[in-house]
């Protein structure tokens, strides 16, 4: 649990300023002021040391949490079959609806259908939903290309 030093410092200052006999209001000499100043400086230095030590401790804990052990480091690249991420195809109707929303109705001539199918089914841009905007741009550029403009 981390406690902020400022409220504690203010509380100590208030406490030190009110300490004394409640009935007597004595004028304080320069020696009392110097000792009070020394106490405050020591208190501030202790708080700084505490916060620096606390942050170093947190950094050390953070480094050890993410470090790989000797066994983990050797096993990391061992089996490519287990580590391969399998991409699950999404609903193709949703893909089609989204691309039609971005591009509008597109027409591809029969000469261009082979290029369209290669682009639509085999590229990363048209198979991963995060890249559908790129796919829409590529499809519109293909549709307006001279090869595909012929009807």
Curated annotation (Swiss-Prot):
InterPro entries: ALKL1/2 (IPR029364). Keywords: Cell membrane, Cytokine, Disulfide bond, Membrane, Secreted, Signal. Its main location: secreted. The keyword Membrane applies. One of its GO terms (cellular component) is plasma membrane. Disulfide bonds join 112-148, 126-135. It comes from the Eukaryota. Belongs to the ALKAL family. Cytokine that acts as a physiological ligand for receptor tyrosine kinases LTK and ALK, leading to their activation. Cytokine-binding is sufficient to activate LTK. In contrast, ALKAL2-driven activation of ALK is coupled with heparin-binding to ALK. Stimulation of ALK signaling is involved in neural development and regulation of energy expenditure. Homodimer. This is ALK and LTK ligand 2.
